[in-house]
Amino acid sequence: MLLAIKDFFNSLLLKELFKGMALTGRYLFARKITVQFPEEKTPISPRFRGLHALRRYPNGEERCIACKLCEAVCPALAITIESDARADGTRRTTRYDIDLTKCIFCGFCEEACPVDAIVETQILEYHGEKRGDLYFTKDMLLAVGDRYEPQIAAAKAADAKYR
């Protein structure tokens, strides 16, 4: 009964309303943290999962061994791989496509890869005017990997103790 009376007076005096207004007032005069995005950029974590890339070994050979683990583990079914056997008995990919309109950027493909062939870079600014522009082929993924290899290697090194 006493609790009901206390609740009645609190609601009658609009205590919750004033607590909310006090909180709003506190943030109204606090320092603003808005970032003007195209001109200013916030730091990106080494674990950020952005645009995909295929990597090469230092001798120039592509890392992907066509094990298809990334294709199997992808929950969105965004990866398509085709492969052929080479003369020395190893397999290499003939087709490696990622449909970024399906991809959910979960990072499972990167975790499943035994040779670190597929990685997600820190690139977050990419777009397409048509739906097909977000369909990345093997050559496009290798070009991204070649262009950003120093950043990819630095991010891998920064994250090495957590892997």
Swiss-Prot record:
Domain called 4Fe-4S ferredoxin-type: residue spans: 54-84, 94-123
A Pfam match: Fer4_7
GO biological process: aerobic respiration
GO terms, molecular function: 4 iron, 4 sulfur cluster binding; iron ion binding; NADH:ubiquinone reductase (non-electrogenic) activity; quinone binding
Cofactor(s) listed in the protein's UniProt record: [4Fe-4S] cluster
PANTHER family the record matches: NADH DEHYDROGENASE [UBIQUINONE] IRON-SULFUR PROTEIN 8, MITOCHONDRIAL (PTHR10849:SF20), NADH DEHYDROGENASE UBIQUINONE IRON-SULFUR PROTEIN 8, MITOCHONDRIAL (PTHR10849)
Quaternary state and interactors: NDH-1 is composed of 14 different subunits. Subunits NuoA, H, J, K, L, M, N constitute the membrane sector of the complex.
Protein name: NADH-quinone oxidoreductase subunit I
Source organism (scientific name): Cupriavidus necator (strain ATCC 17699 / DSM 428 / KCTC 22496 / NCIMB 10442 / H16 / Stanier 337) (Ralstonia eutropha)
